[in-house]
């Protein structure tokens, strides 16, 4: 299985998040910490997950003036997380500063294209007149030209990114749902197997696992599905 699943710890309570890490750790070795859990648990939650032998994806989606992002990424690197995110919309200079701050570290900077909660109408409402697919291609192309190696996009755009002259070596896909499951606030969703077929290197699964009665069972189902696809 080349594609690696990441479980999103979208929980308000650090102790509950750590319980879930311990429960799933025999099967999963990569966990995402977003803004809610990071604000609740601080840097300690990052260290405790890493102490469990797992990698951490710190998903704070930095989008600020270039020097502020440089300073933020400088602090993130000290935590020894595997991935962290910046909004590509912050522009070339901001992306360059993020890369400079992470240089020489093991922390990979991922560029966020268009949130999976957005669709064409959502983009139009904030003044972006073209379709999601066009915006994702534009942003991903710019990020890769600047030097980022990783892109975050929905599974719907994977085929388009595969046609770019410069390819991303890391493609992280959130918005993972099984057929028939509630989409909630996600607009652009995909099943895990389809994401793998499309070329994703990582899928982020949160709510389906968090809300499952048998969390381990669902993770095992996920791994079986991914292993079955060559």
Swiss-Prot record:
Record's GO cellular component terms: cytosol
Record-linked InterPro entries: Aldolase_TIM, OMPdecase, OMPdecase_AS, OMPdecase_bac, OMPdeCOase_dom, RibuloseP-bd_barrel
Keywords (A to Z) from UniProt: Decarboxylase, Lyase, Pyrimidine biosynthesis
Pathway(s) where this gene product acts: Pyrimidine metabolism; UMP biosynthesis via de novo pathway; UMP from orotate: step 2/2
Entry's Gene Ontology BP terms: 'de novo' pyrimidine nucleobase biosynthetic process; 'de novo' UMP biosynthetic process
Residues reported to bind substrate: 10, 32, 59-68, 116, 177, 186, 206-207
Keyword Lyase: yes
GO molecular function: orotidine-5'-phosphate decarboxylase activity
Protein EC: 4.1.1.23
UniProt entry tagged with the keyword Nucleotidyltransferase: no
Annotated disulfide bonds: none
Active-site residues, record numbering mapped to chain: 61
Catalyzed reactions per annotation: orotidine 5'-phosphate + H(+) = UMP + CO2
Job of this protein: Catalyzes the decarboxylation of orotidine 5'-monophosphate (OMP) to uridine 5'-monophosphate (UMP).
UniProt cross-references to PANTHER family, sorted A to Z: OROTIDINE 5'-PHOSPHATE DECARBOXYLASE
Family: Belongs to the OMP decarboxylase family. Type 1 subfamily.
Known partners and oligomeric status: Homodimer.
Protein name from the UniProt record: Orotidine 5'-phosphate decarboxylase
Gene expressing this chain: pyrF
């Amino acid at each position: 299985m080349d594609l690696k699943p990441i479980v999103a710890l979208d929980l308000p309570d650090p102790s509950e998040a750590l319980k879930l890490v311990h429960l799933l750790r025999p099967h999963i070795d990569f966990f995402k910490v977003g803004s809610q859990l990071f604000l609740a648990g601080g840097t300690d939650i990052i260290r405790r997950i890493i102490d469990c032998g797992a990698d951490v994806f710190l998903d704070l989606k930095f989008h600020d003036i270039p020097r502020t992002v440089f300073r933020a990424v400088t602090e993130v690197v000290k935590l020894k997380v595997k991935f962290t995110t910046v909004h590509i919309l912050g522009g070339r200079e901001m992306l360059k500063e993020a890369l400079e701050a992470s240089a020489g570290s093991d922390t990979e900077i991922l560029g966020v294209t268009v949130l999976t909660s957005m669709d064409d109408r959502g983009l139009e409402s904030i003044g972006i007149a073209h379709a999601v697919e066009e915006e994702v291609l534009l942003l991903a192309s710019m990020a890769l030209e600047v030097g980022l190696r990783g892109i975050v996009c929905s599974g719907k755009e994977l085929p388009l990114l595969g046609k770019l002259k410069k390819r991303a070596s890391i493609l992280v896909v959130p918005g993972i749902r099984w057929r028939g499951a509630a989409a909630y606030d996600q607009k652009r969703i995909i099943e895990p197997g389809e994401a793998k077929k499309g070329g994703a290197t990582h899928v982020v699964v949160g709510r389906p696992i968090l809300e499952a009665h048998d969390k381990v069972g669902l993770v095992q189902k996920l791994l079986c599905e991914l292993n079955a696809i060559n």
